[in-house]
A protein has these predicted regions:
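N-terminal export signals
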Residues: 7-31
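N-terminal hydrophobic or amphipathic helices/low-complexity stretches enriched
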Residues: 39-120, 125, 129, 134, ...
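Second-shell loop/turn segments in exported
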Residues: 75-84, 108-121, 190, 215-224, ...
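Sec/Tat-exported extracytoplasmic proteins
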Residues: 84, 88, 93, 97-104, ...
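Noncatalytic luminal/extracellular "stalk/propeptide" segments of secretory-pathway proteins
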Residues: 91-94, 103-208, 215-216
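Soluble metallo-hydrolase cores and metallopeptidase-like ectodomains found primarily
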Residues: 168-201, 256-329, 340-343, 347-348, ...
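Metal-dependent peptidase/peptidase-like ectodomains
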Residues: 310-312, 362-466
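His/Asp/Glu-rich mid-to-C-terminal helical/loop segments that flank catalytic regions of hydrolases
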Residues: 472-513
Length: 513
């Protein structure tokens, strides 16, 4: 029996997490186990490498990461796909992220390309303009009414103990957090990973519970989401929750979880370490306040553009456009590849396009995915002659590692592998996987059994493929163009272009699963 991705990671990781909990779960418990050493635990790692650090430095040799990413050369028979250039596609990424940055610069504290906001509308206008520039036909917006949207507007967290008061720059409310009933003055309790064992002997009723969560690989999934830590805190009577997804640095994060009906915030690792050190000195109280605004009457849109083909069948290339923070990986990278493909195929004569190509940036992924839900609801007619759907989502991100000597992330010259999905025949899967290999698109060893992301609403309604990777930078304020390698965009765009060309040699019936 094939395990789901969630269960596989959960089962494979919990033993490691349990070992991590020995040093992280409780400041008090940690102090009790530290008597065997005369040195503080936090110095142990530094001591391990002190002899190396004492060596005289050698001449440094800087590395230009952008110039050294792995890039596959084109075979002569694939020279036509050389027109899809990563540097050009990345300019689309920068243009889209600039919309998010304007939101931030306009003073919106919970910033990004949020569904239903004017910045979301600006992104749609940008895509619409590109489609017209490329000469696409039937360019239009398809609007959807959104349910009332909740936006955190202001928040604050201060911690006081042992004669000190700390402020924290990296605090962000969960996007779906409850607001606080005015300022809350709460005792702080550290519960480590938040397993049932971590709660033993701790009274959390009416208190602010701090959960330390191991990234798996980041904000999208982490130990607290697997082990039910937040629900456990709520069930045991906590008044509020503070979550740290233990990414090195001091990342601001948008955590898509609920803590029951509790107010909930996330905080970066450096700020969390400061809070933990304060707890190690004695009791700590926190002042927490979250204010939200509910906005009814908002709308979002699919933006469509069409390149007619010679038959009545079609291929749909989609990518959602809303985001938290800069959203370069999520999902300017996908929208940029989708636009790059639209531009590329606009230069192909209609007589050489067997099927109509429909390009769409889809509406409100973080607000219910109205755009792809509409496709599902109208699948009998809208998708009845669709030969392939391609979802472009989080398609290129630098491969990063945890440094072994200090709490830092280290980037590499490689590009993260993507989770991949094929709904269709063995022939379709053969075409897809072969072209990923041809163009150097790194993928996981086992296909996802289902899609995550925006296409999950309609992925069973027609032959479909997807690439997606929700890396450590996903849903953080470090999701910037700098972590989106141009060669990764290029490789994905080229592979999708050739997949389109090759499936056009096959009848739709041959592509169905």
């Amino acid at each position: 029996m094939r395990l789901s991705r969630r269960k596989f990671i959960k089962d494979a990781s919990m033993s490691t997490l349990a070992m991590t909990a020995l040093s992280k779960a409780s400041p008090a418990a940690f102090a009790q186990t530290a008597h065997s050493s005369d040195e503080p635990q936090e110095n142990a790692q530094a001591q391990q490498f002190s002899a190396l650090a004492d060596k005289p430095p050698v001449r440094p040799h800087p590395l230009d990461l952008d110039e050294n990413f792995i890039r596959m050369p084109l075979a002569p028979e694939d020279a036509i796909y050389g027109r899809l250039q990563g540097a050009h596609i990345k300019e689309f990424v920068r243009e889209i992220v600039a919309v998010s940055n304007k939101c931030r610069d306009d003073g919106i504290r919970f910033w990004g390309r949020m569904a239903g906001t004017k910045y979301d509308d600006m992104t749609e206008a940008l895509v619409e303009s590109k489609f017209r520039d490329f000469g696409l036909e039937e360019v239009h917006r398809q609007y959807f009414d959104l349910p009332p949207q909740v936006f955190p507007t202001s928040w604050d967290l201060k911690a006081t103990g042992s004669g000190q008061t700390l402020d924290f720059d990296s605090v962000v409310p969960f996007p779906r957090s409850q607001l606080t009933p005015g300022p809350m003055d709460l005792e702080v309790v550290w519960v480590g990973l938040g397993t049932e064992a971590d709660f033993v002997g701790r009274d959390v009723r009416g208190k602010l519970v701090v959960v330390y969560s191991w990234p798996m690989p980041g904000v999208v999934e982490h130990s607290a989401s697997y082990n039910g830590a937040l629900k456990r805190a709520a069930d045991k009577g906590a008044a509020a929750v503070l979550l740290n997804v233990a990414i090195p640095g001091n990342f601001q994060t948008a955590v898509i979880l609920r803590a029951g009906s509790l107010p909930a915030v996330s905080m970066g690792s450096e700020d969390t370490a400061r809070l933990r050190q304060l707890l190690e000195q004695g009791p700590v109280r926190a002042r927490l306040q979250i204010t939200t605004e509910t906005k009814p009457g908002l709308r979002d849109a699919n933006v469509w553009g069409v390149l007619p083909g010679v038959s009545d069948e079609d291929i749909i290339v989609m990518a959602h456009h809303d985001s938290y923070f800069g959203g370069a990986l999520d999902n300017a990278s996908g929208v940029a590849v989708m636009m790059g493909l639209a531009e590329y195929f606009s230069t192909v004569p209609k007589s050489q396009r067997r099927r109509t190509l429909k390009f769409v940036t889809t509406a409100g992924h973080h607000a219910g995915s109205a755009g792809t839900q509409w496709m599902h609801d109208n699948r009998a007619t809208f998708l009845g002659k669709t030969a392939l759907m391609i979802n472009c989502e989080h398609v290129s991100v630098v491969q990063a590692y945890f440094d072994r000597t200090k709490p830092e992330l280290r980037k590499s010259t490689n590009i993260d592998a993507r989770r991949w999905y094929v709904n269709g025949s063995d022939k379709l899967a053969e075409i897809v996987v072969k072209n990923y290999k041809t163009f150097g698109v790194t993928i996981y060893d086992v296909m996802d059994p289902y899609t995550t992301g925006d296409m999950s609403h309609c992925d069973h309604d027609a032959p479909a493929i997807q690439l997606i990777e929700s890396a450590v930078f996903y849903h953080t304020d470090h999701d910037t163009p700098e972590i989106v390698p141009a060669p990764g965009l290029e490789a994905v765009a080229r592979s999708f272009a050739k997949i389109i060309d090759q499936i056009n040699l096959h009848d739709r019936q041959e592509l169905l699963g």
